[in-house]
């Protein structure tokens, strides 16, 4: 038994997060969530669809979706599906995201998330050195557009990349998708791999696929070991922070 996850009695909820197991152990009356893969698919496909619709709508109004306020709108619009649907689904079909996704977590889990974030940075850096020998220089789509921003748009974009994206993506991937796969009785290690694969593919950055897959694997392992999506959020924030700060500092200097 994983010592980081309390014993439960939540046998009807495979892959149940720490918060769910703790609540059961404390005698709280919870219901077995009925959300699942259908909701995970709605979240991911909905996010892609929203991204396309919003970008096309902005362009039809002569607003650049990769610059200024248009960028902020295009960047955040998919979050309505990516995080919004999982939150709605768990609220209606479960016990809310705090319990069903393990957003409630002890400090020990968050500290582990911080350490894992540092590990993901080290792994990504090492892999990047190897990958660039075959692909040439690497860059992220978010980084490229971020460097062209100024003023309040720049600051908001950096904050969204540093905090917003990790929170939203972890709710979608290590929260909803991970939970749905685990509820389908898949092996927990396979769940980590699948969520990492989908996470990497979702970014639509072929050159960075291996890097994103490695990061996703570490984030998934954090979720598996702790049972806390919040721990994965902390790790993701740590991973995104250096690049976000680089965008801010570099853009301010130009």
Residues of each region from the PLM?
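N-terminal, membrane-interfacial amphipathic/helix-forming hydrophobic leader that caps
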Residues: 1-112, 121, 125, 129, ...
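Helix-boundary and loop/linker segments of multi-pass membrane transporters
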Residues: 28-33, 64-65, 102-106, 144-153, ...
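Alpha-helical transmembrane segments of integral membrane proteins
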Residues: 34-46, 70-74, 108-116, 153-157, ...
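A generic helix-loop boundary/linker signal
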Residues: 47, 91, 100-101, 117, ...
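Non-cytosolic membrane-interface motifs at loop->transmembrane helix junctions
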Residues: 66-74, 142-146, 217
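Hydrophobic/basic alpha-helical segments enriched in Actinobacteria
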Residues: 89, 93-98, 104-105, 113, ...
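Transmembrane helix-loop-helix hairpins at the membrane interface
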Residues: 121-122, 138, 146, 150-254
């Amino acid at each position: 038994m994983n010592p980081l996850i309390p014993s439960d009695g939540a046998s009807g909820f495979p892959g149940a997060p720490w918060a769910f197991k703790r609540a059961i152990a404390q005698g709280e009356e919870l219901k077995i969530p009925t959300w699942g893969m259908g909701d995970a698919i709605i979240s991911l496909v909905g996010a892609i669809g929203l991204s396309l619709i919003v970008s096309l709508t902005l362009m039809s109004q002569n607003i650049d979706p990769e610059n200024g306020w248009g960028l902020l709108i295009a960047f955040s619009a998919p979050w309505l599906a990516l995080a919004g649907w999982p939150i709605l689904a768990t609220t209606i079909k479960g016990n809310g995201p705090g319990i069903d996704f393990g957003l409630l977590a002890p400090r020990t889990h968050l500290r582990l998330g911080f350490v894992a974030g540092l590990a993901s940075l080290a792994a990504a850096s090492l892999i990047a050195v190897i990958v660039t020998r075959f692909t040439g220089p690497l860059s992220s789509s978010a980084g490229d557009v971020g460097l062209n921003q100024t003023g309040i748009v720049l600051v908001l974009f950096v904050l969204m990349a540093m905090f917003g994206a990790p929170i939203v993506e972890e709710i979608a991937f290590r929260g909803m998708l991970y939970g749905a796969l685990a509820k389908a009785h898949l092996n927990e290690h396979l769940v980590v791999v699948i969520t990492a694969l989908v996470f990497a593919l979702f970014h639509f950055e072929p050159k960075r696929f291996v890097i994103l897959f490695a990061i996703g694997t570490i984030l998934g392992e954090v979720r598996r070991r702790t049972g806390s999506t919040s721990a994965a959020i902390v790790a993701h924030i740590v991973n995104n922070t250096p690049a976000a700060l680089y965008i801010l500092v570099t853009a301010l200097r130009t």
